[in-house]
Swiss-Prot record:
One of its GO terms (biological process) is tRNA methylation. Catalyzes the methylation of 5-carboxymethyl uridine to 5-methylcarboxymethyl uridine at the wobble position of the anticodon loop in tRNA via its methyltransferase domain. Catalyzes the last step in the formation of 5-methylcarboxymethyl uridine at the wobble position of the anticodon loop in target tRNA. Has a preference for tRNA(Arg) and tRNA(Glu), and does not bind tRNA(Lys). The keyword Transferase applies. The gene is ALKBH8. Disulfide bonds: none annotated. Zn(2+) binds at residues 242, 341, 343, 349. Its EC number is 2.1.1.229. 2-oxoglutarate binds at residues 227-229, 328, 334. Its cofactor is Fe(2+). Residues 43-120 form the RRM domain. GO terms for molecular function: 2-oxoglutarate-dependent dioxygenase activity; iron ion binding; S-adenosylmethionine-dependent methyltransferase activity; tRNA (5-carboxymethyluridine(34)-5-O)-methyltransferase activity; tRNA (uridine) methyltransferase activity; tRNA binding; zinc ion binding. Belongs to the alkB family. Residues 411-664 are annotated as: Methyltransferase domain. This is tRNA (carboxymethyluridine(34)-5-O)-methyltransferase ALKBH8.
Amino acid sequence: MDSNHQSNYKLSKTEKKLLRKQIKARHTLLRHEGIETVSYATQSLIVANGGLGNQVSRNQLLPVLEKCGLVDALLMPPNKPYSCVRYKTVEESKTAYDTLNGKEIVDDLGQKIILYLNFVEKAQWKELGLQALPPGLKVIEEIISSEDEKMLLESVNWTEDTENQNFQKSLKHRRVKHFGYEFHYENNNVDKDKPLPGGLPDICESILEKWLKEGFIKHKPDQLTINQYEPGHGIPAHIDTHSAFEDEIISLSLGSEIVMDFKHPDGMTVPVMLPCRSLLVMTGESRYLWTHGITPRKFDTVQASKGHKSGIITSDVEDLTLNKRGIRTSFTFRKVRQTPCNCSYPLVCDSQMKETPASFPESDKEALQLEQDYVHRVYEEIARHFSSTRHTPWPHIVEFLKALPSGSLVADIGCGNGKYLGINNELYMIGCDHSQNLVDICRERQYQAFVCDALAVPIRSGSCDACISIAVIHHFATAERRVAALQELVRLLRPGGKALIYVWAMEQEYNKKKSKYLRENRTSQGMKEEISNDASVQELLVKQLPNVGNQDSAHSVSSINDFQDGGCNSKNVANSKLPIHTNRTSFHSQDLLVPWHFKGNPGKDKRVEPFGPLGSRDPGPVFHRYYHVFCEGELEAACRTLNNISILQSYYDQGNWCVILQKV
C-alpha cells in the first residue's frame, strides 16, 4: 500500500491492519537479516510468511506468484520465514504487490497463513561453497529392489510376544527392535556379555552376504537395530561409541527418504539426502569424528531439481523446496568390537581418553569446562525438544512483566525459546542465550535475541529498566560464578531498575506441600532405580567429566555460608563424584547431574513443569545437565554480596527460589 494511495482517502480498519503488518515485516527483515525494503516499486519483492521456515514449499508458492506475471526467479533460503521473488517487469511486480498483500494461503501442514509483501532493490544471502561428503561416507542408491524392501518391512513383527527378547520397545512415535545385541541409547553401546538369542534375521543374512560379495561393505555385522520413525521424529546428533563397534556402520532406509545432518567439530554441517532403499555407509572420519543426526520435523528442505536423489543439500536458494516426510524404517547394522579402539581420533575416542575421577571444580577454568560439557553442549543437542516442553509462562513472572511501565527496556538473560519475550507488547524486550539453537527458535518466532555468555552480556551498562533471569544461575558451577552472573544482571540495570531471578530449589517440598516437579511423578519405581543405580552411566560420566578438585563450590564464597546454619539438609559431597539425580524425586545433593530423556516429535510433548526434566520409560538418548540447586536463603545471601542493590521481595514458587531486587 503506497503513500499516494493512503493520502487520497482514509484507510479502512482492514487496510490499517495490513499496513501495520507490512511495517512489522520490514522492521523484522532489517533487524534480523539486514535486508532493507524500499517505498517505490521494483522488480523484486520480499514475501513475508512465504518461506520454507513457514512450511511453505516452492511448489505451493510459485503458482500463486505466477498468477501475477512472469517469475524470473524465486529465492527461498533454508529455514527462513520469507522468500524473494523477482518478476520480469516492474509492472508485474506491482500487480503482485497489490494482489497478494494480505492474501491467505494454506501451508503444507494445513494451517492458514497470510502473506505480506514489500519491495526491495535486491536480496542477497550468503552462499556456502560447494561441500563434499564427509570423508569415509558414501550413499549407495537402490541397493535393494522394491520387492526386497516390501519383504524386509513385512518381516518385522511389531506385535510378537513380549516374552521374546527381541520384542520391540515403543517410544513416542517410534518403535525399536534389536537383534544380536540390544543397543543402549543412554550410552550408544551394547552389553557384549549379553548377546540376544537367535542372531540376525535370516532375511538379512542373505542380503548382507550379497553386499559383502559385491564390495559394498567390508565386515559382516552381528548387531541390528530396527527403528520405525513417524514424521516429526528425529535422532539427536551423536557418534556411536568407538569402543563398542568396528569401523563400519551401515544403515538401510526403507519406506521414506530422509535428510541426515553430519557435523564436524569445527561447526561445519553437511545435510545429506538418504533416499528410500539406499544404504548409508560410515567409515573412517565420518564414523569416528563427525556426529550424525536427524532434525525432528515433518518437512525436510531439499533441492527441487534433484528430487529424492542422494547427495548434499546445497544452499542454492533458487532450487530449494520442502519434502514431506513419511514413515521411515531404518535397519542399522554394526559389528561389535572385541578389542579397544585405536583410531586416529583420540580426543573423541573413549578407548584412548584419559579416565579422570569426577569431583567439583576448584578453578574457574575447570568450572567453565564443566559448564561447557554438561550445560552448553547439552542444550544445543536438546534445543528443539526442550523448547517444546517450555510453552506455558509462569504466572508470577507474567505478573512482574505486566507491572512494568509501558515502554520499558527489558533484557531476558538466558531467554531459552523466548516464551517470556512476547508476554507484554508494551515493553521493548530483548533476549540472549548461550545456545545458538534456542536463539534460532526465538528468531523463528520473530523475537529479538542473540547469542552470548550470561557473564558478559554485550548491552550497555545502566541501559535496562528491568531484567529477568529464569532458570539460568543454577547452571553455574561455582559460587563465584553465580555471584558474577548476578553482578552482570545488576550492571545492565539503570538506578531504580528491577531484576527478577528464579533458581531451582533444594527444597522440593515446602510448607508441607510438594512442588509440581514431585507431584507429577510419571516414572515407575523400576525406572527410578535404573537411572539412579546405573553403574555404566555413572562410569561413562566419570570418563567424560574434567579433572576437577575437591572443593565444594557451594561454600567457596564465605559470605554465603551464613544462611546455612541448620538450614540446608544436603549431603556433604566434597571429595565425591557428581551424583546423578533420580528424576521426580527429592534432591540429596546441591551439585548434581540431572538426566534429560530425549523424546520424539517435540511438538506434541505436553509438560507443565518449568525447569526440571521429566523421567521417561523410553529407552531413548539420555543427556545429563549440571545443576546447583539452591537452599532456602542462599539466593538472597548471594544477592547481598552485591553492594548496590536492595532486595524488594523473595519467595518460593513451585520448587524454585525467587528474588526481586532493585539497583540503588
